[in-house]
Amino acid sequence: MSFLHVDHVTHTYFSIKEKTTAVRDIHFDAEKGDFISFLGPSGCGKTTLLSIIAGLIEPSEGRVLIEGREPNQKEHNIGYMLQQDYLFPWKSIEENVLLGLKIADTLTEESKAAALGLLPEFGLIDVEKKYPKELSGGMRQRAALARTLAPNPSLLLLDEPFSALDFQTKLSLENLVFRTLKEYQKTAVLVTHDIGEAIAMSDTIFLFSNQPGTIHQIFTIPKELAAMLPFDARQEPSFQTLFQTIWKELNSLEKQQRNH
């Protein structure tokens, strides 16, 4: 059985005046350690699907299974990393990083040492007693990654985590996240609008069409490209070829959206 099984998921939002189907008949599998990306026009249901996988929304139809069971935060310890770091400004970096362990009631001397040990791995030296406002945007996002990984999640969900950063910081964090997830054998799902980011970080890209969101096309990243650090992958001719292919498909979908 696959690690992540999305079984013909459809989700519809209802209001007093209308109903809107955000995603329709989404079906795919991902194995442990896979990195997959959702790419597509704005409003195609990528974040809705991510929320369904996280167990935050129950789908109107279909189901999601993680290791054969429906998503459950206590059982699966799902990690979420968002566009903003959402560090609590009144808490120190140490307190922020340990927050998930405290909430899950799994904070021990051993788990504390392991969590705080992530900080120097991520280039954050002597920051434990500092507060978020004392760190740069890139440093805060690194601290947020440490907080996300501290409870040892089985699945990591990334909702445009680099989009608010400058390009140099973004490239650096892409490498860091990629290397960390490979080292710890984490399964990850990335939502992004950035074609290059999706190619550089993923094993598989799901390109979504809009209204309602459906899987328009699936791109499997060549193994030699998927094994490279994102920065190195961006230099490869095969990266540019795949970028152009996906860009044309995405551009066609966006034109269709504008014409409706």
Curated annotation (Swiss-Prot):
Transmembrane segments: none annotated. Its EC number is 7.-.-.-. SMART domains: AAA (SM00382). It is an enzyme of class 7 (translocase). GO terms for molecular function: ATP binding; ATP hydrolysis activity. CDD domains: ABC_NrtD_SsuB_transporters. The keyword Translocase applies. ATP binds at G40, P41, S42, G43, C44, G45, K46, T47. Signal peptide: none annotated. Keywords: ATP-binding, Nucleotide-binding, Translocase, Transport. Coiled coil: none annotated. Residues 4-231 form the ABC transporter domain. It holds the Pfam family ABC_tran. Belongs to the ABC transporter superfamily. This is Uncharacterized ABC transporter ATP-binding protein YtlC. The lineage of its organism: Bacteria, Bacillati, Bacillota, Bacilli, Bacillales.
